[in-house]
């Protein structure tokens, strides 16, 4: 199937919004998986007209890195807030296709349903791939919340019009929180548990932290011929 033309093609503002709303109604907001052996971290980086998409596959219990898939291509879509998945989704799909080990769950550096139309990149790509997914962002896109306590594991819910769409989660004592929302085929409570389990030494969960590092290095090497 040509996923890019079906799910990530710009159709004009109104039609693209309609597509987002249509897909968002199909998002599964409960745990729809049994075993969790492999987890994937997903991130992209862009410089000038190049974009790198990375998926890092780790063993869930040990967080041992098993595989890294990197794809680099031309940027074919401008940066438009609320439509990030149309810019980054296609390169992530290419990275997914090249994986020998397919993760049981993906953690994205970005939003899940904590999005104006409840379809951030974690939800959009998770739905297209039919894979459980979580959004874990460094900044909030939309919604209101109270600051959680300073202790690791503390969290407060994110609300949009009195609807719970995510949680602000403290992954380290006295460090800025992350913004967690379910992506697809997972509950918010399980999403929070997994983010805390995979956040060991740093603010960001290890799969996402590593994906970010690899995407930056890959793009720097592609453009400048040197590693960071």
Curated annotation (Swiss-Prot):
Enzyme kind, highest EC tier: hydrolase
Cofactor(s) required, per the database record: Mg(2+)
Chain positions recorded as Mg(2+) binding sites: 43, 109
Site (Interaction with target DNA) location in chain: 79
UniProt GO BP: DNA repair
InterPro entries documented for this protein: Endonuclease-V
Annotated EC: 3.1.21.7
UniProt cross-references to Pfam families, sorted A to Z: Endonuclease_5 (PF04493)
GO molecular function: deoxyribonuclease V activity; magnesium ion binding; RNA endonuclease activity, producing 5'-phosphomonoesters; single-stranded RNA binding
A single GO cellular-component term on record: cytoplasm
Catalytic reaction annotation: Endonucleolytic cleavage at apurinic or apyrimidinic sites to products with a 5'-phosphate
Source superkingdom: Bacteria
Compartment(s): Cytoplasm
Alphabetical UniProt keywords: Cytoplasm, DNA damage, DNA repair, Endonuclease, Hydrolase, Magnesium, Metal-binding, Nuclease
CDD domains reported in the protein's UniProt record: Endonuclease_V (cd06559)
Keyword tRNA processing part of the UniProt annotation: no
PANTHER family: ENDONUCLEASE V
Function in brief: DNA repair enzyme involved in the repair of deaminated bases. Selectively cleaves double-stranded DNA at the second phosphodiester bond 3' to a deoxyinosine leaving behind the intact lesion on the nicked DNA.
Family from the record: Belongs to the endonuclease V family.
HAMAP family xref list: Endonuclease_5
Designated name of the protein: Endonuclease V
Species per Swiss-Prot/TrEMBL record: Dictyoglomus thermophilum (strain ATCC 35947 / DSM 3960 / H-6-12)
């Amino acid at each position: 199937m040509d996923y890019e033309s079906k799910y990530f093609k710009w159709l004009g503002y109104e039609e693209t919004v309609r597509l987002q709303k249509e897909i968002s109604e199909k998002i599964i907001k409960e745990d729809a998986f049994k075993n969790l052996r492999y987890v994937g971290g997903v991130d992209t980086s862009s410089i000038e007209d190049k974009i790198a998409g990375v998926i890092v596959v780790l063993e869930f219990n040990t967080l041992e890195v098993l595989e890294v898939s990197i794809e680099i291509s031309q940027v074919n879509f401008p940066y438009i807030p609320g439509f990030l998945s149309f810019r980054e989704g296609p390169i992530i799909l290419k990275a997914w296709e090249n994986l020998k080990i397919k993760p049981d769950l993906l953690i994205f550096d970005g939003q899940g349903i904590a999005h104006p139309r409840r379809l951030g990149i974690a939800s959009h790509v998770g739905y297209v791939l039919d894979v459980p997914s979580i959004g874990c962002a460094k900044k909030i896109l939309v919604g209101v919340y109270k600051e959680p306590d300073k202790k690791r594991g503390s969290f407060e819910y994110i609300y949009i019009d009195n609807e719970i769409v995510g949680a602000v989660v403290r992954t380290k004592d006295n460090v800025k929180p992350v913004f967690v929302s379910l992506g697809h085929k997972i509950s918010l409570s399980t999403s929070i548990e997994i983010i805390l389990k995979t956040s060991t030494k740093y603010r960001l969960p290890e799969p996402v932290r590593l994906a970010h590092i690899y995407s930056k290095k890959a793009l720097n090497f592609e453009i400048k011929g040197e590693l960071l």
